[in-house]
Amino acid sequence: LEKTNAWLTQFGDKIGGIWAANDGMGLAAIEALRADGRAGKVPVTGIDGIKLAVEAIQKGEMAGTVAWDPFWQGGMGLAIAFDAKTGVFDPAKEPKEHREFYGTGVIITGDNAQAYYDSNIKSEPTLHWKDIWGRVSGQIQYN
């Protein structure tokens, strides 16, 4: 909030958009923009896909956010441990892409905010733990 207020004072109409490292910061920026009469006029994006951010997107005050899907992240940890413990697979024999991998995030904008809200906030998402690698988007690469 304080940073955005300072930027609005210093840069005024030169601010064409605000990227925030998380939704909480993005929402604070929106609060400052509201006080300046510019909420919804300056695009603000965040990361996390929290309820208040999705609601701000629905109101047109926030341009977007990325949800990293905490249900899936937590579930993956449990599903992998469960499958290893019950003998579904042997982690020592799994390829490297099943040890260090990226998950697929969800980009939330005005186009899909209501659908995301309905399926991930208003209710719990449907996840398929029989296919634990189905949402993996690739192996982490190191240079």
Predicted features and spans:
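A residue-level marker of the well-folded mature domains of exported/periplasmic proteins
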Residues: 1-143
